């Protein structure tokens, strides 16, 4: 009977519940009649609501980036006395520092080096264009300040907006170029003397260093040259002695031993043999048999033989001599008044 009563009660509940309201009423009655069943359904609904809330909260989260975007007020650009002054808040001490740059001569690399020298805590610094392209270190400051850019220091990104400046007209640009040329000439005229002195001092120091390296080699060369000169002189005197001996023998045979009729063919063959020897010298040396050149050749043969025997570094000696000659030539050109760009009147007075 209990089972039949339970089935009739369930049929009654199902007949009363229709749609959303019926479901709510059924739940209430079920909870009232069966407390355990109502608690379990209530916990299940609460769990589903919690899951949907967590998913919605995760979907509403934004993307997280590694770098921090800092307002542009931390980096400002102003012009003072015609020069751009960039104020940057340094990351280590969190204080502002001004950098005065020269728009013509300075570049992006100079500005970045100044930042790293001023704050040793900067590990990475770079400049990017608004679309994310890195600006080269060789780019001039005047070109950088024509448009907005991004300054990245470590993990901070600064959006910099330089003040817009009016571009010069063609006439003003030409006048500015003339002024730059005049200033450069004036600077050269005023500083040329100091530049000349510094360059002259540098060349003199180089000459002294080269001569100091050449001194020990020069002593060895002088000794080898002295021996080669001595041997060459002996060869020359030996040739003269040979010719004198030959003359004496021919004279003895011509006037004392035999007659001229017999010695004439002998002297002819001796003369012809001497001509053949000179021609053989030309074939071997590709030089004409002239006494000064023959003497110099013999001297060089003795010199190189002595240098090889003494292990003299002839190549290094020649390089040092060439370097000294070049330095002396540069020093002479440096002291030439025409190279100093002096006015014509002063050059005329010196001449």
Curated annotation (Swiss-Prot):
Effect of substituting residue 259 to A: Does not inhibit calcium uptake. Strongly reduced sensitivity to ruthenium red inhibition
Originating species: Homo sapiens
Location(s), subcellular: Mitochondrion inner membrane
The protein, known as: Calcium uniporter protein, mitochondrial
Region: Juxtamembrane helix, residue numbers: 285-290
Pfam families xrefs: MCU
Induction details: MCU transcripts are down-regulated by microRNA miR-25. Down-regulation by miR-25 may protect cardiomyocytes against oxidative damage in cardiomyocytes.
InterPro entries referenced in this protein's UniProt entry, alphabetically: MCU_C, MCU_fam
GO cellular component: calcium channel complex; mitochondrial inner membrane; mitochondrion; uniplex complex
Gene name in the database record: MCU
Residues where Phosphoserine is found: 57, 92
Impact when changing residue 289 to F: Mitochondrial calcium uptake in the absence of EMRE/SMDT1
Annotated transit peptide: 1-50
